[in-house]
A protein has these predicted regions:
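Hydrophobic scaffolds flanking metal-cofactor catalytic centers in soluble metalloenzymes
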Residues: 1-154, 159-162, 170, 174-178, ...
Length: 200
């Protein structure tokens, strides 16, 4: 959420702990509204996102079950290791009454890369470059275009999907080789690799 940008700027959450979910990606939709989706959630309650949003990356490589990287353990009890500085969604969540969280998500005040990089620009000289890289990458291989190709069955659609995947891989590799990005910043600046995204 935009309100949480200060927590990133203050260093509570390192940039490497943030991942970008791009418009067009398929994601779980557990709320009651449809502000974040292009279509009604279908099988497994997933739908394509209509807006970009930043979120804390989960621990491990698996999308489900997702586990917060800030969930720790003390004396056998689960504890939030950043409780005093937890993000708005975490402060809003109450497991037995999810309506406030659903309303928050419906409001749609999500932080995106452009906003975050603009906020970081004063103290991070590479923020403008990150914004340029994100825009160039999005223009060449958006998640929405990629999933349109994935849905197609023609030879042309399959060829276009393979082309987008190759470009995505090459763009990421070049960013790291030219030292424009550290590997752990790729999920924030460029989003997750297209070939690794969950599919409907």
């Amino acid at each position: 959420m935009r309100e949480d940008a200060a927590l990133v700027r203050e260093g509570v959450f390192p940039l490497a702990d943030i991942v970008c979910l791009r418009a067009g990606e398929w994601a779980r939709h557990d709320g009651g509204g449809s502000h974040t989706t292009n279509a009604a959630p279908g099988k497994d309650n997933v739908a394509p996102l209509s807006v970009e949003m930043l979120k804390l990356a989960g621990a491990g490589d698996s999308a489900h079950p997702w586990r917060c990287r800030y969930l720790g353990s003390t004396d056998g009890l689960s504890v939030c290791t950043v409780h005093a500085h937890r993000p708005l969604q975490c402060r809003t969540l109450f497991c037995t009454h999810t309506a406030p969280l659903e309303q928050l998500m419906e409001r749609g005040d999500f932080l995106n890369r452009e906003q975050l990089f603009a906020l970081l620009a004063e103290g991070e000289p590479r923020a403008a470059l990150w914004a340029q890289l994100a825009r160039a990458h999005e223009e060449a291989c958006s998640a929405a275009d990629y999933f349109r190709c994935c849905a197609g069955t023609s030879d042309e659609a399959r060829a276009r999907r393979a082309e987008i995947e190759r470009y995505d891989r090459a763009f990421r590799q070049l960013c790291v080789e030219r030292q424009a990005l550290e590997p752990d910043l790729l999920p924030l600046v460029l989003g997750r690799p297209l070939a690794a995204l969950p599919r409907p």
